[in-house]
A protein has these predicted regions:
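Charged, gly/pro-rich active-site loop segments
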Residues: 67-181, 221-319
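Short, basic/aromatic recognition patches
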Residues: 1-9, 163-193
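Residue-level detection of beta-strand scaffold positions
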Residues: 7-8, 56, 123, 266
Length: 319
């Protein structure tokens, strides 16, 4: 499942200890000991949060595109190792791995065009060493979960040193109102995932069985096998994508949670985060992607300079 899943919910912690969860594509670590995700060098926030606080979580609960029938829901909590000391090697790995896992994304596109997209292919990798796992047969979370714990003393390698200078600012303006996100996604992005902070200080991401809009956010129904949720900061994520992963839609709202009954949680929304959603037909997706490139490409040289490295090239493996 870890190898074939197209998307995973990746949760990291802000400076204040609040969880932020973003859907991304998972890959098995090259040594088989970690589950890895990546983020673009030109939008490094997901990696920088993990560099500051390595406690992260992954939720495998979306089987679309995996060709797996009725896979279990798996929550992984672990320690992150951020890798950006060799940007060319990172880029080479991402080009190779993404072509193998998601061939439809670039099918039919000339290599000469793809080689110009180094603003996108230049990557920071986040290698996650699992410490704790829980799993259920389905998103319904029926019954107590299966559990696995890493051997005592398991540790993750240290992250590469943080680059000099300031992290680039956000490049997308967030929605002015979380209520607009609720209205816009109603009945369309119905798969919700909730992230809270566990008693051990790690993010904990869980699938929501069903949700009801409320005046101050949502009432979220979790399965009977869900762990108890303590009051505190929380993140609600909505996501959808076609099986070919030729587009995606993401929405994220942050706020707080409190218990509201048996397996029911009240999520009080505070604000919506900016999201990078590219949906529609192939032509629409291509145009939006090019527009994104015009905004992010100027950051590439600056981010490489911060790391005292050359701008990486997009190099495709020889057939």
């Amino acid at each position: 499942m870890f190898e074939r899943a197209v998307t995973v919910e990746y949760a990291s912690l802000t400076r204040t200890g609040a969880p932020v969860t973003i859907p991304t594509t998972p890959y098995l670590g090259e040594d088989g000991r970690s589950i890895d995700v990546s983020t673009g060098l030109t939008y490094p926030a997901k990696a920088e949060r993990a560099r500051r606080d390595p406690r992260v979580a992954l939720l495998f609960a979306d089987p679309v595109g995996s060709d797996l029938r009725d896979p279990p829901v798996v929550v992984v909590q672990g320690l992150a190792t951020v890798r950006d000391a060799d940007l060319q090697a990172n880029t080479d790995r991402y080009v190779r791995a993404s072509q193998e896992k998601l061939p439809e994304v670039t099918k039919g596109q000339p290599r000469i065009v793809l080689r110009r997209l180094n603003w996108y292919y230049a990557r920071i990798w986040v290698e996650i060493t699992p410490l704790h796992m829980r799993w259920w047969p389905s998103r319904a979370l029926d019954g107590a979960p299966g559990t696995w714990n890493a051997p005592e003393g398991t540790a993750a390698p240290l992250s590469d040193p943080a680059p000099n200078g300031q992290q680039p600012p956000a490049w997308i303006t967030p929605p002015q109102s979380w209520r607009a996100v609720v209205e816009e996604t109603a009945g369309r992005l119905s798969m919700h995932d909730l992230t809270v902070v566990d008693g051990n200080g790690f993010p904990l991401c869980l699938p929501v069985a069903s949700s009801e809009p409320a005046e101050d956010g949502y009432l979220l129904h979790l399965g009977p096998g869900a762990p108890d949720i303590a009051p505190g900061p929380a993140c609600l994520t909505m996501h959808t994508h076609p099986a070919s992963f030729t587009g995606q839609e993401n929405r994220t709202i942050v706020g707080t949670v409190a218990a509201a009954g048996d397996a029911i949680v009240r999520f009080r929304a505070e604000r919506a985060l900016a999201d990078w959603s590219i949906a529609g037909g192939k032509a629409v997706v291509a145009l939006r992607f090019l527009a994104t490139g015009r905004r992010l490409a100027p950051r590439l040289k600056a981010e490489c300079r911060r790391r005292f490295q050359a701008v990486p090239e997009v190099r495709f493996p020889r057939s």
